[in-house]
């Protein structure tokens, strides 16, 4: 399998022939963090790379440091206007003028296919060997769904990413 979720470590491991892409869940499976991308690693606990045990602590442990946490956490898909002052992955504005968005983790699914991206250029899975991880995230205030797609073409040593946003 190209994609594995370790329930005990809350880590998703996506592997090709030569690379690993590791994504972690933090703070009681609330936040999706980028852990590692690089040379293939196997069976290692890389959660320490999320640095959630260091100050500023995760919001469930210290609510006063919420903004500091957002500004330092290696978010896989960062929000906007909630304390993370780095370049954000998403920017929205509602009719009421709300613009703060913080997608948090809801669930995941792993499929044995590459989803199509209508109207967009994308890789194809003619041999039907690709595997896709879908991380379902949601901003409850804006009622905004953010689905993160990661497709692994293990034999081609390629991982593709895309995002689908809906409200």
For the regions a language model picked out, list residue spans one by one.
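N-terminal accessory beta-strand-rich subdomains and adjacent acidic, glycine-rich linkers
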Residues: 1-167
């Amino acid at each position: 399998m190209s994609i594995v979720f370790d329930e005990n470590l809350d880590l998703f491991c996506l592997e090709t022939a030569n690379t690993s892409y590791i994504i972690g869940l933090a703070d009681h499976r609330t936040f999706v963090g980028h852990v590692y991308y690089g040379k293939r690693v196997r069976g290692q606990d890389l959660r320490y790379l999320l640095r959630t045990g260091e100050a500023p602590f995760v919001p469930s442990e210290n609510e006063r440091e919420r903004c500091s946490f957002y500004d330092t956490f290696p978010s896989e898909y960062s929000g906007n206007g909630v304390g993370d002052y780095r370049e954000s992955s998403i920017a929205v504005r509602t009719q009421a003028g709300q613009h703060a968005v913080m997608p948090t983790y809801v669930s995941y699914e792993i499929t044995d296919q590459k989803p199509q991206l209508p109207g967009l250029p994308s890789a194809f899975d003619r041999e039907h060997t690709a595997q896709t991880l879908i991380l379902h995230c949601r901003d409850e205030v804006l009622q905004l769904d953010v689905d993160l797609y990661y497709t692994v073409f293990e034999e081609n040593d390629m991982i593709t990413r895309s995002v689908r946003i809906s409200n």
